[in-house]
């Protein structure tokens, strides 16, 4: 049964009936109008409600929910800026190493024989080749593609990759042969190409979360990064054989960024991240540091991540 339409005033009354205090009606109404009930309330209320009764905990306010939403918006902006840097780097690296191995003819990146014969490659290759064929021969939404078709009857990969998403680049990396993967991994100082592929897969997923405005701080991926030296150096607790955090959560993306960004880039990113977390905790005490870090998958010593050499 569809839910009935509620005016902003009715939405506020609904929140009050659930036990949520609204200290400033004008500010609440403004947020509901500017952002919407679903993104703010449905997205963040679970951290202030009793899960068994669905009633807000005593003392919870709309301002608490809005503050958490605004923290997450800032976190997404910080993460997305760093993720875009990696996206540019991996796009450039994939195009360069593939062209160095096979040349600049589009016929090469459209040829399945130029890719690995592994299970992972075979899984992604059919859709990858269809997507690359569309970019090379049919896409009319990018003028630079049309120009290369007209002028050269060929769209080299270093042009085509600019029309690919981070997720598509991730799939192409998966499909490459071991020699190309190893050279790309070496660029980033990552010894194991499989580790690089895992980092990129996770970062591509988090890039989508950020770009689509989904709740980030408590997000969990369906794929994980491998165990790294940083997990051990940061003293992350283990539950059985598995690390309790830094595998599928936001901190897994932070670890991947630590490996893939330059030192100066990561230090600048970390400084913004520290300011964001500290700023939220100092301005709103409704969740508390321990609960916030647990939701984000951040270990207690997360700020020491730049102390250790990779």
Predicted feature locations:
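Long, contiguous internal "core" modules enriched in hydrophobic/ aromatic residues
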Residues: 1-310
């Amino acid at each position: 049964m569809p839910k009935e339409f509620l005016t902003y005033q009715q939405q506020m009354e609904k929140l009050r009936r659930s036990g949520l205090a609204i200290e400033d009606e004008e500010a609440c109404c403004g947020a509901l109008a500017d952002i919407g009930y679903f993104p703010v309330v449905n997205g963040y209320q679970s951290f202030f409600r009793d899960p068994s009764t669905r009633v807000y905990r005593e003392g919870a306010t709309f301002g608490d929910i809005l503050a958490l939403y605004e923290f997450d918006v800032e976190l997404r902006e910080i993460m997305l800026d760093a993720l875009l840097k990696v996206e540019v780097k991996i796009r450039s690296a994939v195009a360069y190493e593939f062209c160095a191995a096979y040349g600049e003819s589009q016929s090469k990146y459209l040829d399945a024989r130029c890719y690995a014969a592994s299970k992972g490659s075979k899984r992604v290759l059919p859709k990858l080749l269809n997507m690359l064929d569309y970019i090379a021969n049919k896409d009319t939404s990018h003028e630079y593609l049309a120009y290369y078709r007209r002028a050269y009857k060929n769209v080299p990969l270093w042009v085509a990759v600019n029309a690919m998403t981070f997720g598509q680049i991730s799939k192409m990396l998966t499909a490459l042969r071991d020699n190309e993967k190893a050279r790309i991994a070496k660029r980033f100082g990552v010894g194991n190409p499989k580790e690089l592929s895992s980092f990129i897969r996770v970062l591509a997923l988090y890039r989508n979360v950020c770009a689509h405005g989904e709740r980030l701080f408590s997000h969990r991926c369906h794929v994980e990064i491998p165990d790294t030296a940083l997990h051990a150096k940061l003293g992350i607790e283990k539950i059985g054989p598995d690390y309790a955090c830094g595998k599928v959560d936001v901190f897994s993306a932070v670890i991947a960024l630590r490996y893939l960004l330059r030192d100066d880039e990561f230090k600048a990113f970390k400084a913004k991240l520290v300011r964001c977390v500290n700023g939220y905790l100092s301005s709103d005490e409704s969740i508390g540091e321990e609960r916030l870090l647990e939701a984000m998958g951040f270990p207690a010593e997360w700020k020491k991540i730049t102390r250790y050499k990779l």
